Regions:
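Catalytic-core segments of class I nucleotidyltransferases/pyrophosphorylases
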Residues: 86, 105-109, 136-198
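N-terminal glycine-rich phosphate-binding loop and ensuing alpha1 helix
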Residues: 1-38, 42, 79, 98-103
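Alpha-helix/helix-capping structural signal
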Residues: 18, 92, 99, 171-172
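Short loop/turn motifs at secondary-structure junctions
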Residues: 8-10, 81, 110, 143
Length: 198
């Protein structure tokens, strides 16, 4: 969330699932805790608690069934509307001077197309990720022309480049996701939908 806010994002939707109620509480105002901290003179902690609840406009939607990242992204359709939007995988923490999602938003502004963060992974690990077919354009910019989610054989590996837990997508992805058949593990894979527009 802090990365998104640092990138200038003010409206944030967090897709959760069963057992994640504490996450919602974390970003909520906590008058009882604030009162306790104020009475005990812990002003530094009080300020931190107040800042957390005021970081951004944060909403939550529950993904009732674990049907994959594509299914989770599809849950955001009514929140997003027809605007481009950022996707930040919940299990990926990326640090840097310029937030990773800010860099992608800037590149989206330059190219006007969907943008994904890319990382190079070890050959022995590529089967755990999506493999991207890329063409180097300039500096650290690549054009992605194809992708394969979790390649199972060496022939399916397009390269050792994979998605780096961040992307900026156009709203057109929702219609594609609605028509994407479940893939690996019976899940709706975001990469399968993104492949349609690569």
């Amino acid at each position: 969330v802090e990365e998104a806010v640092a990138a200038g994002i003010t409206d944030i939707l967090i897709i959760t699932n069963r057992g994640k109620g504490l996450m919602e509480d974390h970003f909520d105002a906590s008058p009882e805790l604030e009162s306790l901290l104020e009475k005990s003179g812990k002003t530094e902690f009080l300020e931190t608690v107040r800042n957390i609840s005021n970081l951004a406009n944060i909403s939550f939607i529950r993904q009732k069934e674990m049907k994959g990242l594509g299914h989770a992204v599809l849950k955001a359709k009514s929140f997003v509307g027809n605007e481009p939007f950022a996707v930040m995988y919940g299990d990926g923490v990326i640090t840097g001077k310029v937030p990773a999602i800010k860099q992608l938003i800037d590149h989206y502004g330059e190219y006007g197309e969907g943008v994904v963060g890319v990382k190079k992974v070890d050959a022995k690990d590529i089967h755990k990720y999506g493999s991207l077919k890329v063409e180097h354009m300039h500096d650290n910019i690549f054009a992605c022309t194809d992708m394969k989610e979790k390649p199972q054989t060496p022939e399916e590996v397009l390269s050792l480049y994979s998605i780096l837990d961040r992307c900026v997508l156009l709203a057109e992805i929702f219609e594609i996701l609605e028509n994407t058949k479940p893939g690996i593990g019976g899940e709706i894979q975001l990469t399968d939908a993104m492949r349609e527009i690569a």
